[in-house]
């Protein structure tokens, strides 16, 4: 039976396979089959753990912050692999592996409480698609962040085209996630939008990326400014995901999850 006690085994194996894939990618001047194979294997290992944890908990592992970090690492591996296959950047797997590993290590050092309870509001048809679509969009935009940082410090203006494609895809999924969330909110709480702190930061993040898209389509802005905008938009995304939970104003948010067993059921919230 796969449970959270087994996570260190799957995490170590996944990260090891991803690192091997990154090394093969860096050592090859063309797209490496070994890099693709090792990366896919790492993704599959983490996917098996997620599926096993889902079976063990008898609920989708999407409720706690630790569980969303797990999905982020999984989707980050996929996003990095797709970027490598499409644009053949040898270094992208190294950075996507690093970003995935950071969240894996956080989960190893600060595991959440993973029980089987699921508050009534989370027992909704919108729960799984809303959270998974959001986490996939975060991962795609994470790759755009990697491209932006590399383009900024290596003075590679041509990377903007790749960043554009990643932002288009990421914002599309982000918008779908927001739409699904609003439908879920209407069903659970009677309002499509309540402007609580996390929702406010979601709009800030969304607007940051929309400004980037509009500047690329209609503006005459230098590549350095555009890369900086992408970096700050990604930082806003991190604030929306977990940073806002540390703000005093967020304590009454309908999205806040307090992962303590003794907390009463009405105060439990989803992390997205």
Kindly label every feature range from the protein language model.
Residues 1-19, 129-141:
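Hydrophobic transmembrane alpha-helical segments in integral membrane proteins
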Residues 45-99, 109, 182-203:
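Membrane-interface helix-loop-helix modules in multi-pass inner-membrane proteins
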Residues 17-24, 41-52, 73-80, 99-106, ...:
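Membrane-embedded alpha-helical transmembrane segments of multi-pass integral membrane proteins
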Residues 44-55, 101-129, 151, 171-189, ...:
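C-terminal ends of transmembrane alpha-helices
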Residues 174-224:
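Glycine/small-residue-rich hydrophobic helix-like segments
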Residues 24-31, 56-59:
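Short, hydrophobic transmembrane alpha-helix segments
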Residues 261-272:
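Single conserved hydrophobic/aromatic residue that forms the stacking wall/gate
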Residues 30-42, 90-97, 159-170, 223-230:
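Membrane-interfacial loop-to-transmembrane alpha-helix junctions, especially the N-terminal start
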């Amino acid at each position: 039976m796969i449970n959270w006690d087994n996570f260190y085994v799957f995490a170590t194996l996944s990260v090891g396979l991803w690192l091997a894939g990154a090394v093969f990618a860096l050592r090859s001047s063309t797209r490496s089959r070994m890099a693709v194979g090792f990366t896919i294997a790492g993704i599959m290992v983490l996917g098996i753990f997620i599926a096993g944890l889902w079976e063990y908990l008898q609920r989708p592992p999407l409720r706690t912050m630790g569980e969303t970090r797990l999905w982020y690492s999984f989707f980050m591996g996929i996003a990095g692999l797709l970027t490598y296959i499409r644009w053949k950047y040898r270094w992208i797997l190294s950075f996507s592996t690093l970003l995935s590993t950071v969240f894996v290590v956080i989960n190893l050092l600060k595991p959440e409480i993973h029980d089987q309870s699921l508050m009534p509001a989370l027992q909704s048809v919108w729960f799984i698609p809303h959270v998974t679509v959001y986490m996939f969009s975060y991962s795609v935009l994470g790759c755009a962040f990697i491209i932006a940082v590399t383009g900024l410090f290596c003075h590679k203006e041509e990377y903007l085209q790749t960043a554009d494609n990643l932002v288009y895809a990421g914002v599309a999924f982000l918008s779908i996630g927001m739409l699904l969330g609003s439908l879920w909110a209407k069903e659970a709480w009677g309002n499509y939008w309540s402007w609580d702190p996390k929702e406010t930061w979601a709009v800030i993040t969304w607007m940051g990326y929309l400004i980037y898209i509009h500047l690329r389509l209609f503006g005459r802005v230098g590549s350095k400014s555009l890369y900086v905008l992408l970096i700050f938009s990604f930082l806003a995304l991190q604030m929306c995901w977990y940073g806002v939970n540390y703000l005093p104003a967020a304590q009454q948010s309908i999205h806040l999850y307090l992962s303590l067993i003794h907390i009463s059921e009405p105060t439990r919230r989803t992390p997205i």
